[in-house]
Amino acid sequence: MINTFIKKFPESSSCLKTLKECSFDIDNNVFLTNSPHPAYNYDDIKTKYASNIPCKNDCLSSVDSLLEIDGKLLWIEFKNKNITKSETISIKRKASESLLIFIDVTKFDLKQVHDNSEFILVFNKNKNPALLKREQNKKIVDYQGFNTITDNLAKLSGDHYIHFGLDSLELAHFKRVYTLSSSEFENFCHSHHIATQ
């Protein structure tokens, strides 16, 4: 699917970077992954796309990166900050508008893109104290192994918990949605044969 996008929007071919570069937080001078795996910097693609429409760059938002693994599009947003409700709204907007750009360029229908797309939010666990507190409480309240049992059942069923209210993206936009800490993302990369260092 990415090849179709590049063919129809050749300016985007210059936006190929690494996941590490796409994860860079300029405000804090930090990377959320060290992966050298090639990925398209979708923010750069969005800027090139927006230069062709009247509203220019400020009317669109986008996720940080896009890559294709085993025929699946992986849309990735990196967040090195506390994810508030307003930040969640911003993330949903970025995801939606990223898909709109892709669909406009490729002319694929939404169902086709949905069925071949996964969204990943990679976040800094240390900057999300409510999530850390919930995990600490989970360990304290683990009534006779209840949390361990439910976690194992979720793993067996292929389910996963989606943080920050982003589960609605899985219903409408993407086949799967993941919210992963930086270390969980490294594990995800290993299990999906994405280079990590």
Predicted regions and their residues:
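Catalytic cores of nucleic-acid endonucleases
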Residues: K81-E135
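Short linear motifs at secondary-structure transitions and domain/linker junctions
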Residues: Y40-Y42, A50-N52, K92-L100, A154
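Polybasic (Lys/Arg-rich)
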Residues: E11, N137-Q197
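Catalytic micro-motifs at enzyme active sites that drive phosphoryl/nucleotidyl and oxygen chemistry
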Residues: I53-C55, D64, T106-L110
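Acidic-basic catalytic patches of nuclease active cores, encompassing PD-(D/E)XK
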Residues: M1-D58
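Short, flexible loop/turn elements at secondary-structure junctions
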Residues: S23, V30, H37, I69, ...
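Conserved catalytic cores of phosphodiester-cleaving nucleases, focusing on short active-site segments
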Residues: S65-L67, G71-K81, S98
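Beta-rich catalytic cores
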Residues: S61
